[in-house]
């Protein structure tokens, strides 16, 4: 059975990056598999990983079965940068990246001598789509006095135009450091994450107006109603969410930080405002606790993604097996672009090392206290 095609709308910043229109893209909807097919594919994938001496590197947002395969075969399930670092440091010469295209590109930039494959090269990201390099370069050229800071969710070409790359777990600290040095900033592409960091640091930040189509759907009105229904629940929010959602959070953090909070916080119930793919890892990490999806439907909300990235959903058992069997869907990054893009990535890694801070949480809430910058009433 062939995959269907799903139209997807996303925020498309207009000229100069100061206003937003609507862009149109598409995502494949994979054909469902019977239970017997799934088990056969899992066994085939395990054998192919061994045959190809490959390692599976998966994001928290992909299908639970792919996350399980990564864990069972000595791979990695992590956020985008930890995926790339794992691939760089692992002995395998073939990395299979289950995620979206910018993750494969970042893995290739950090592991230029390795073969990087992806189940589907068309798996993209609304933040990446909403920040075309030509338009972004013109935006930067119009403000030459500003330091360019881009989020990991961008193409290699956009990273190559930047001074710094950040992830959601260290962006606050890097921007605070730049602000303390008196630097004015261009921030791209996520306006919600940028606004959160700007509010926390007071930095002079000129924003590109992109957004994640998953997190942008969460709305404060419905979340507040759900909180009233479950007053004992802690609210975990990714900072790509709108300001009204962040304001209701008990913890704001990256994917890794939210998982860590679910384990460490003294609560039995959590409302989670990020891609529902993360719930698999949360349930494994904190068995016995209850996780409730933050609402993406209601009077003020929509359900364009229903809290699951349509491009992450393109990573499935069938195309994972196929890419291992055929060795296609290889990621290539132009050498000149890769060389320039590695500069802002290495700056972030060097900053983290100098400040003795991992880019993801360490697992110790006391040690990571500064990462949980937005803690509301219990």
Curated annotation (Swiss-Prot):
GO terms for cellular component: cytosol
Pfam families to which the protein is assigned, alphabetical: NadA
Keywords, sorted A to Z: 4Fe-4S, Cytoplasm, Iron, Iron-sulfur, Metal-binding, Pyridine nucleotide biosynthesis, Transferase
Any single GO BP term: 'de novo' NAD biosynthetic process from L-aspartate
Positions with a binding annotation for [4Fe-4S] cluster: 125, 212, 309
Coiled coil: none
InterPro entries: NadA (IPR003473), NadA_sf (IPR036094), Quinolinate_synth_A_type1 (IPR023513)
GO molecular function, one term: quinolinate synthetase A activity
Source organism, top-level taxon: Bacteria
Required cofactor(s): [4Fe-4S] cluster
Catalytic activity: iminosuccinate + dihydroxyacetone phosphate = quinolinate + phosphate + 2 H2O + H(+)
Binding positions for iminosuccinate per the UniProt entry: 59, 80, 151-153, 168, 238-240, 255
PANTHER family per UniProt: QUINOLINATE SYNTHASE, CHLOROPLASTIC (PTHR30573:SF0), QUINOLINATE SYNTHETASE A (PTHR30573)
Family: Belongs to the quinolinate synthase family. Type 1 subfamily.
HAMAP family the UniProt entry points to: NadA_type1
Name of the featured protein: Quinolinate synthase
Source organism: Burkholderia thailandensis (strain ATCC 700388 / DSM 13276 / CCUG 48851 / CIP 106301 / E264)
Lineage, top ranks: Bacteria, Pseudomonadati, Pseudomonadota, Betaproteobacteria, Burkholderiales
Encoding gene per record: nadA
């Amino acid at each position: 059975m062939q995959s269907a095609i799903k139209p997807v709308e996303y925020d498309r910043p207009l000229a100069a990056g100061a206003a937003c229109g609507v862009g149109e893209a598409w995502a494949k909807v994979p054909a469902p598999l019977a239970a017997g097919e799934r088990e056969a594919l899992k066994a085939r994938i395990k054998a192919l990983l061994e045959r190809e001496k490959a390692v599976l590197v998966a994001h928290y947002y992909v299908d639970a079965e792919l996350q399980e395969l990564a864990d069972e075969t000595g791979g990695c399930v992590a956020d985008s940068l930890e995926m790339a670092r794992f691939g760089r440091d692992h002995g395998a010469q073939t990395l299979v990246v289950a995620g979206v295209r910018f993750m494969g590109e970042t893995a290739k930039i950090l592991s230029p001598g390795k073969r990087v494959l992806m189940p589907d090269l068309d798996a993209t990201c609304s933040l990446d789509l909403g920040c075309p390099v030509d338009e972004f370069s013109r935006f930067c050229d119009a403000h030459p006095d500003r330091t360019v800071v881009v989020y990991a969710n961008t193409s290699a070409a956009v990273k190559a135009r930047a001074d710094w790359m950040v992830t959601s777990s260290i962006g606050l600290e890097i921007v605070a450091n730049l602000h303390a040095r008196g630097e004015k900033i261009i921030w791209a592409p996520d306006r919600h994450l940028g606004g959160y960091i700007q509010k926390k640091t007071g930095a002079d930040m000129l924003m590109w107006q992109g957004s994640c189509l998953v997190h942008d759907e969460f709305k404060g009105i419905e979340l507040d109603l759900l909180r009233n229904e479950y007053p004992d629940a802690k609210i975990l929010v990714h900072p790509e969410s709108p300001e009204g959602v962040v304001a209701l959070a008990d913890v704001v953090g990256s994917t890794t930080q939210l998982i860590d909070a679910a384990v460490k916080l003294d609560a039995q119930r959590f409302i989670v405002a990020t891609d529902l793919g993360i719930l698999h890892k949360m349930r494994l990490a904190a068995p016995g606790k209850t996780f409730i999806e933050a609402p993406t439907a209601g009077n003020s909300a929509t359900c364009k993604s229903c809290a699951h990235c349509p491009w992450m959903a393109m990573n499935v058992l069938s195309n994972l097996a196929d890419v291992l069997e055929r060795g296609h869907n290889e990621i290539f990054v132009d050498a000149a672009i890769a060389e320039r893009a590695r500069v802002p990535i290495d700056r972030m890694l060097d900053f983290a090392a100098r400040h003795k801070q991992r880019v993801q949480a360490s697992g110790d809430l006391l040690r990571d206290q500064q990462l949980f910058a937005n803690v509301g009433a219990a």
